[in-house]
């Protein structure tokens, strides 16, 4: 099982992981063709340059782990684009 497969398995498990980091999210999103772009302040967006699909998120600080609603938004976005089922 590849590292991306392991990260995806952790991302979609129930209950949502409490220790999924921003760096792990960047790896997953990059795998699906998304690029991380800076917004104002802690706002970040992932844009798929091929499909122009955007995922808008707030990067928490100083702790960069994702919280439940962020994980749900990411899962919904990836499902809507057909990247995960």
Q: Would you name each region that the model predicts?
A:
Residues 2-40, 49-85:
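Basic nucleic-acid-binding interfaces
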